[in-house]
Amino acid sequence: AIALGQSYLNIKKKKIKLEMSQAIAAVGQIHLAGEFQKLFDKNKFKSGQILITPDDTEQRRRALNVRRTFDNLFKLKAIPIVNENDTTATSEIKYGDNDRLAARVAQIIGADTLIILSDVDGLYDKFNKNKIIKKVLKIDNKIYDLAEKKINTYGSGGIITKLEAAKICMNAGCNMFLGNGKKNGALERMIKTKSYTHFVPKISTLHAREKWIISSLSSSGKVYIDNGAARALMDGKSLLAAGVTKVMGNFEKGENIMIVDEKDKNLARGLSSFSSLEIDKIKGKQSGEIENILGYLSKSEIIHKDDMVRL
């Protein structure tokens, strides 16, 4: 939208202030939607536009609203065209790439497959430039080491954002395929030649709420816990204040945070029942002491087991 707006307004500057780029995006967005509609009209398809910011996917209530909008567009037999809302997104709070945006949308709407089209035939082994890694079952350091990390090789987002997108999909039980969209008949060609990388999802037993928690783009903070609390977590228990030893980050009640053990190993993610300031006051304390310390008691658990996904 920004690039199209610059072209329409005949702005040739490469460095533009955030406030101005948001206004330029507003101009470009109209023309971008118009171009899409022309293409769909030629083939007698209806379409609708959804503009998204991270707030729309990272806040649970708003994510559910996004899903309802998609569901209703499908009922209307209209194809959703999704883009980041560059008119309101800031440099601090934005996706900045379509890979993770697409994966998060796929997770929210419960899609079984996401196809990302780039300018290459798949994920290449950097030690053998002619070899495409056909199937990825797990994204770990080996995959990051194998992958060529040049941004311009895999489009604007680069290979890192594509691997992050694949992680989101795999955790949500969604297949992801990476292939070449630069050639005519891209999807048909991918199927016929099998020129793609398939990121195979885990067999997911998670509920939609749990998928949303684990697929969050980032955690707002961390709480460190002792060994006793770590064992309780692995037994399926909630996290209590008594087991918390340290808080890192600045977050509010309801935000997605990481639970970490004494060896700095990530154990779980969950929605905090308290802000970081509140947890700092009650860490190491018994549940019965919370009301006296804070002056009120909303919940006795730092993170309830139903709001937590173990990693």
Task: Describe every region a protein language model picked out.
Residues 1-311:
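C-terminal catalytic "cap/lid" subdomain
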